Amino acid sequence: MKKQYVTLTVNGREYRFSIGDGFGQVPPSETLSQTLRKRLQLTGSKESCSEGACGCCTVLMDGKGVTSCMLLTVDCDGKDIVTIEGLEDPEKGLDAFQCGYCTPGIIMAAKALLLENPHPTGDEIKEAMSGNYCRCISHYTVLRAINRVAGNEEDHLAVMHRANDDVENPIPVRQELFLSPYANGTNSDHSLD
């Protein structure tokens, strides 16, 4: 029997959507990112590459970081989803970002890491954040902020300098991110709101 409804718990609130191609229904081809942004007006998570490569659309699903542009809403039935809007009491005063476009995805990826491993090493943080791209090159300040939140006793400047020790790839970032047609933020379907 074909599913007629999809039920999601988003930021602690339950939503039930009718599945179909009619007005007000969630089409079977609609991504979780589209549902969150268009239907629930949760625009904190961004959709930049639409390929799961940049991490801007990261949300937590059942406590794990996922790229919401790669998941169909109909496949998320019964899942518990937390968006950037659902996080409370954010750490303040670390000034890790510049333009802010990547911020929601990076924060959600960092939250997923810290849920899984509350005290990651600097190298574990670098690896966990390798799927998120910051086009303002704020990677070092992001790593420093996550190290601080994780309670690492390491000197945060040393962590930043060690990131440069590997000259071939100072911070692991997927190279295909630089080929994205949306990297400059000018595609009208991917607004900054």
Where are these regions (language model features)?
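Signature of N-terminal electron-transfer/Fe-S-associated modules in redox systems
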Residues: M1-D193
